[in-house]
Amino acid sequence: MVMKKILIIILFTLLSTNSYGVEKKTNFTKEIFNKAKSEGKTIVINSYEEWCYTCTKQVKVLNEAEAKFTDIVFLSYEQSKHEDIGKLLNIEFWTTIVVYKGDEEKSRLIGVAKKKDIFNAILKGI
């Protein structure tokens, strides 16, 4: 009986942790970023952590945006594993979304996960 309870606890822990995991991978490189800037493209950068609930919500919205805005460059990176990128972009916190149009930063959100707010921030860069 004790073993059964332990297995249930382990299973519950694994399932609940997995449901918050971010299914996003780092695709940010300086080369891609600099090329998109020099071409005057709209760029959306997302800083996340795999375990972060808000990040998971943001990723879902950003995936929708990426499907809708096919001419925008979407870049992401895991903050704790790529602090150099955070320093380059002056991003201190995960859950940060920054929108550029070429060289110019057009909007910055921290901790915002509502679709309307994220889409409005992206539209400022178009």
Regions found by a protein language model. Give the residues of each.
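Sec-dependent N-terminal signal peptides
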Residues: I6-L15
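Structural micro-motif
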Residues: L89-V98
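Non-catalytic, surface beta->alpha helical segment in thiol-disulfide oxidoreductase systems
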Residues: K101-I126
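Typically the conserved alpha-helix immediately C-terminal to a functionally engaged Cys/Sec
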Residues: T56-K68
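A short beta-strand-turn-helix
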Residues: K25-K41
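Sec/Tat signal peptide C-region and signal peptidase I cleavage site
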Residues: T17-E23
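Short active-site neighborhood of thiol/selenol oxidoreductases, capturing the structured segment around
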Residues: S38-E50
